[in-house]
């Protein structure tokens, strides 16, 4: 009887030999290692992808911040260009500042000169005490006004108004088309131009505000 016939007569032995002839443990172990390696690679890949996503997100934030800074710088540059165009050049700006400084000095000088003239005017005027305070009576102008008081009732009314103004410290400087306001609290003089562009309401409000200081 051949070996094949013996195996067929004993199938259990036959299956045992067949199983032993196929040693798949190494293959199973190899597949496990491969599966493990694949899992490791997958985890590392996901970690790298997450890290790259974080870098991209951070880069986007920095990019947006840079865009905002660039927009601000562009706005500043445009404003600077407009200012440069307005003043022309640095030398022109310096010249303008010097001119303004000179103008300010001239105004201060004129103000001081006017104050001196006003002090001289007050010096040549008579100070009359009244129950309500003191008033200024000009020695030179009053006689001329009194002569004019006999002309017409309207002129007399205007003269009375001028006397009232003068008693309050308001003097009409018709020669220079302006009003001089003597502030009693500090002795300084305020000037109100008799400009037609100014309303009577504004002129009256300005005078009373100065008299109240």
UniProtKB/Swiss-Prot annotation:
Give an example GO molecular function.
identical protein binding
User: What Pfam families does the record point to?
Assistant: Spc24
- State where the protein is found: Nucleus; Chromosome, Centromere, Kinetochore
Under InterPro entries, the record lists:
Ndc80_Spc24, Spc24_Fungi_globular_sf
* GO aspect biological process, one term: chromosome segregation
Q: Which UniProt keywords apply?
A: Acetylation, Cell cycle, Cell division, Centromere, Chromosome, Coiled coil, Kinetochore, Mitosis, Nucleus
Q: Which domain of life is it from?
A: Eukaryota
Does Iron show up as a keyword for this record? no
Q: What is its main location?
A: nucleus
Residue positions, PTM N-acetylserine: 2
In the record, the note on similarity to other proteins reads: Belongs to the SPC24 family.
- Described function: Acts as a component of the essential kinetochore-associated NDC80 complex, which is involved in chromosome segregation and spindle checkpoint activity.
Q: Which additional comment does the entry carry?
A: Present with 1750 molecules/cell in log phase SD medium.
Q: How does it assemble?
A: Component of the NDC80 complex, which consists of TID3/NDC80, NUF2, SPC24 and SPC25. The NDC80 complex is formed by two subcomplexes, TID3/NDC80-NUF2 and SPC24-SPC25, which are joined end-to-end through their coiled-coil domains. It has a rod-like structure with a length of 570 Angstroms and globular domains at either end. The TID3/NDC80-NUF2 globular domains are probably directed to microtubules, the SPC24-SPC25 globular domains to the centromere. Can also interact with MPS2.
* Name the UniProt record assigns to this protein: Kinetochore protein SPC24
Q: Which gene encodes it?
A: SPC24
């Amino acid at each position: 009887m051949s070996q094949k016939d013996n195996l067929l007569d004993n199938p259990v032995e036959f299956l045992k030999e067949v199983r032993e002839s196929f040693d798949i443990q190494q293959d199973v172990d190899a597949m496990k290692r491969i599966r493990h390696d694949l899992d490791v690679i997958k985890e590392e890949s996901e970690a790298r992808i997450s890290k790259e996503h974080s870098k991209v997100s951070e880069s986007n934030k920095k990019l947006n911040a840079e865009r905002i800074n660039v927009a601000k710088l562009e706005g500043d540059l445009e404003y600077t260009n407009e200012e440069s165009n307005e003043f022309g050049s640095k030398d022109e700006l310096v010249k303008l500042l010097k001119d303004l400084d000179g103008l300010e000095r001239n105004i201060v000088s004129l103000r001081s000169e006017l104050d001196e003239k006003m002090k001289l005017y007050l010096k040549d005027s008579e100070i009359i005490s009244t129950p309500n305070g003191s008033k200024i009576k000009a020695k030179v102008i009053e006689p001329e006004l009194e002569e004019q008081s006999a002309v017409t009732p309207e002129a007399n009314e205007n003269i009375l108004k001028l006397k009232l103004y003068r008693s309050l410290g308001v003097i009409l400087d018709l020669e220079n088309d302006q009003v001089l306001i003597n502030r009693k609290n500090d002795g300084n003089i305020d000037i109100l131009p008799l400009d037609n562009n100014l309303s009577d309401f504004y002129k009256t409000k300005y005078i009373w505000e100065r008299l109240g200081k």
